[in-house]
């Protein structure tokens, strides 16, 4: 199978790995009012999805071994579509249940995508990783921008959430023939697992795996914390839901150039620590700005959102790219990313819930402080990972 065809399929699947999640925050206040939910319970919807992403990430290497990487990848994205359909029923139970299915599918798919890139697109792993993360961001941008208009057009917030089943199932159908043609050649060509990294076991004793887990915990906490609470935060500042949803869409768009360019630059220059540190600094400055000066004259919120998005846009793919660069083959990449993403998503799943509780109890400043703590954890991990050859 030609690498370009595999890349096309990967991009189609990846576009669905944030769309279902990003469509919920602009509707969060509407959902709360309609279903009578507290901020903590409304945050649990997103937290449940992200925690199930952690479960899916931990299970990813076992799913890879049992069902085959390419076939399991298609099935995981199909599960995202099914979960979106379940969320089309306007009830708190189905909202949470559908989010659980979506989260598990995203978690498994994220691990398997790293292995597919290592196996079929290893020559340009940094660019390929940046490309599929950009596809994820485009999906998130479209979803967040259209969430409120779709709710108005289709007659309710539940329809706006359910509609994202369509692209997920279409992408699965596109991937099916690619998976059928790539599975056997890939299996025949794959080298045996390296010492200490087994397909069915997570590499807890591996230094890179542990450090990238800490890194992903920091960047994922910041990403999903802002994804869940950026629009509601500015709702609380007096913005309309449409304007807050547009800010979230701009936040998503701002991630795209960083995700596309920075991993490739880091790969070419062999300066992973420099770029990771620069991106973390951008996200931290934006977070501090949003906390200290949420509504300075005219353009302030947009500047903070773009600084945050630029830093987080490159932060996530840099964490995946360093795994692809420093692991010997696809099985090792899947196992290492499974541990890193599992730990990262566990932290990120707890963060929106904790932030929701803090919003109810103390207000948004205490909630945003959680994100600054995550930035400190990420900074330590960046320093310890270092550059290649250290």
Tell where the protein language model's regions lie, with residue ranges:
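Helix-loop-helix hairpin linking two adjacent transmembrane segments in secondary transporters
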Residues: 92, 123-124, 131-183
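Helix-to-loop junctions at the C-terminal end of transmembrane segments
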Residues: 56-68, 258-271, 359
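Conserved MFS/SLC helix-loop-helix module at the cytosolic interface between two early adjacent transmembrane helices
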Residues: 55-93
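Cytoplasmic helix-loop-helix junction between adjacent transmembrane helices
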Residues: 100-135
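Intracellular juxtamembrane helix-capping segments at the cytosolic ends
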Residues: 108-121, 314-328
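A late C-terminal transmembrane helix in Major Facilitator Superfamily
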Residues: 325-364, 370-374
